[in-house]
Design a protein with these regions (language model features):
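Surface-exposed, beta-sheet-biased, low-hydrophobicity segments with strongly acidic/polar composition
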Residues: 3-297
C-alpha cells in the first residue's frame, strides 16, 4: 500500500510538470504570435510615379508628375486617401479641391484633410488612463471634456451630452451620402460598442460599420479605422469624419486648421481605379523650378 501511494504521487507530479510545460510552451508561442504580428495593409495596390514633363519653370503652375497604380485591383476612394509629395525635406499635401490642413502642434487630436478635401482623417491620443481626450466635431479639434462631441480613453469612447447617433451597416463610409432611415438610439449614457477583440493576436479591430452622429444642427458620418497609429502604438484611435447634413461646418472657416493646398490632383474620377493615372500640379506655389528629387507618400 505504501509503494502504491508513492507511485500515485509520482504520477501526479509528472502529470503536473507536463501540464506546466505545455502551458509554458503555449504561452511562449502566443506571445511570439502577438509580438511578431504584422498589421494588414489597407490596400495591396502598389504605385509608380514619373515626370510629367522634361522641364519645369518658375510659374508655380507646373504639372510635376503622374502617378498610376502599378499593380493591384483595389479601387480607392479619395475620402480614404492622402497624397503628398516631399521636395528638399519639405512636405506638400495635395488634394482634389485645392485645400488642405495646417499641421497641429501640441495636441492630442491630430486632424488632416484627405485627398477629397472634404473628409477629415483624425487620430486621437487616448493613451491616458486617468483622463479623457475630448474632441469637438464642429471644429475638428481637441477641447475640454466639458464641451466635447466625443471623448476617448483607451478603448472607451462616449458621445457628448448633446450628441446622438445611429449605426449603419448596409452602406460604406463612401456610399453614405445622406441621413438614412433609422433611429438615433445612441447617446452619452453608455460607451460605444465600436470594436471586436481578436484574442489570438491580442488586437483591437474596429467593427465594419458607420456612425451617423447628430449634434445641434449638423449631422456627421464617422468610421473608426484603427486603434493603432502608423507606428503600431495602441490607444491612438484613427477615424474618418465628414459633414453629412445641416449647417456649414465651422472647421472649414478656421485659418489655423484649413489652408490652401500647395498642389492639386488632376485627372481624377470619383475614385481611383487601377486603369487611371493622375497628375500632380503646383497650385500657386513654386514647389520645383529646376531639377529636383520628389518623393511621394
Amino acid at each position: 500500500m505504501l509503494i502504491l501511494s508513492i507511485n500515485r504521487k509520482t504520477d501526479f507530479r509528472v502529470f503536473a510538470i507536463f501540464i506546466a510545460v505545455v502551458l509554458l510552451i503555449g504561452g511562449l508561442l502566443w506571445a511570439w504570435v502577438v509580438v511578431s504580428y504584422t498589421p494588414d495593409y489597407t490596400t495591396e495596390n502598389t504605385f509608380s510615379g514619373s515626370d510629367y514633363q522634361s522641364s519645369v519653370s518658375t510659374s508655380a503652375e507646373d504639372s510635376l508628375l503622374t502617378i498610376e497604380i502599378d499593380s493591384g485591383e483595389d479601387t480607392l476612394g479619395w475620402d480614404q486617401l492622402s497624397i503628398s509629395i516631399q521636395v528638399d525635406n519639405q512636405d506638400f499635401p495635395c488634394s482634389l479641391t485645392g485645400i488642405s490642413t495646417v499641421q497641429q502642434e501640441d495636441s492630442k487630436v491630430n486632424t488632416r484633410l484627405t485627398a477629397d478635401g472634404t473628409t477629415f482623417a483624425i487620430e486621437v491620443d487616448a493613451s491616458s488612463e486617468d483622463s479623457f481626450t475630448g474632441i469637438n466635431l464642429q471644429t475638428m479639434k481637441q477641447v475640454d471634456v466639458e464641451n466635447h462631441s466625443m471623448k476617448f480613453s483607451k478603448t472607451d469612447i462616449f458621445l457628448g451630452n448633446d450628441s446622438v447617433a445611429m449605426i449603419v451597416t448596409n452602406q460604406s463610409f463612401s456610399e453614405l451620402q445622406s441621413i438614412p432611415n433609422g433611429t438615433f438610439d445612441l447617446d452619452d449614457s453608455e460607451r460605444l460598442d465600436w470594436y471586436d477583440y481578436d484574442f489570438s493576436v491580442h488586437r483591437i479591430n474596429p467593427k465594419d460599420q458607420v456612425y451617423v452622429i447628430q449634434e445641434s444642427n449638423i449631422t456627421y458620418k464617422l468610421q473608426f479605422i484603427s486603434y493603432y497609429n502608423d507606428a503600431d502604438e495602441s490607444r491612438h484611435i484613427q477615424m474618418l469624419v465628414a459633414w453629412l447634413n445641416g449647417s456649414p461646418l465651422p472647421a472649414f472657416d478656421d485659418p489655423t486648421l484649413i489652408a490652401e493646398s500647395p498642389c492639386i490632383i488632376e485627372g481624377a474620377d470619383d475614385s481611383w481605379s487601377p486603369s487611371q493615372s493622375i497628375t500632380i500640379r503646383e497650385n500657386g506655389i513654386d514647389i520645383c523650378n529646376q531639377a529636383c528629387s520628389v518623393e511621394i507618400s
